[in-house]
Amino acid sequence: MTEAHNACCHPSGTAAGHHGAGKASTDMMDAVDRRLLDIIQTGFPIEPRPYAVLGETLGITECEALARVRALRERKVIRRLGANFDSWKLGFRSTLCAAKVPEDRIDAFVAEVNRHVNVTHNYLRNHEYNIWFTCICPSWEQVCSLLDGITERTGIPILNLPATKLYKIRVDFRMD
């Protein structure tokens, strides 16, 4: 890699500040950002230099493609950049979970739930069942063991709601 490439694509220091508490900022997006988002939602290049491929597709440099993705992440427009797998076809099992958590115990309960890498989503809702999360494990036995362990450590029962039929697994947010 050239010195210019390193300076552009691997700047020293840290990102500049946070823009709000988790709120995405889309007001500074141009047409290239929108095209970039359309492409990477479903067709992120599986290549040794994916940002070079993105840059070529968009008519920009590799460094600019990487810089744009970084900026979109910093502004929380991109929340996650990674692969999605069909966990069921890989033999994994997942479930939707709900719990009635007293308000004064929410932080402790959420901390216990979130410490498990098997938990993929966790939401606070305005409902009798106020904490909802999903978990995925290599087997049903491990799903049940994980949920039993959380209940044991927190004293809060968890409603286990495995899917009986899958209707939709993904969505693309078209930007054009």
Swiss-Prot record:
Its UniProt pathway annotation is: Porphyrin-containing compound metabolism; protoheme biosynthesis
- The organism sits in which domain of life? Bacteria
Q: Does the keyword Nucleus apply?
A: no
Bias class Low complexity marks the residues at 12-24
Q: How does it assemble?
A: Forms a heterodimer composed of AhbA and AhbB. Also forms heterotetramers.
Give one Pfam family. Answer: AsnC_trans_reg2
What this chain does, per the record? Answer: Involved in siroheme-dependent heme b biosynthesis. Catalyzes the decarboxylation of siroheme into didecarboxysiroheme.
Annotated stretches, region: Disordered? 1-24
Q: What is this protein called?
A: Siroheme decarboxylase alpha subunit
- GO BP terms: heme biosynthetic process
Identify the coding gene: ahbA
Keywords, A to Z, come to: Heme biosynthesis, Lyase
UniProt keyword Lyase, yes or no: yes
Q: Which family does it belong to?
A: Belongs to the Ahb/Nir family.
What species is this protein from? Answer: Nitratidesulfovibrio vulgaris (strain ATCC 29579 / DSM 644 / CCUG 34227 / NCIMB 8303 / VKM B-1760 / Hildenborough) (Desulfovibrio vulgaris)
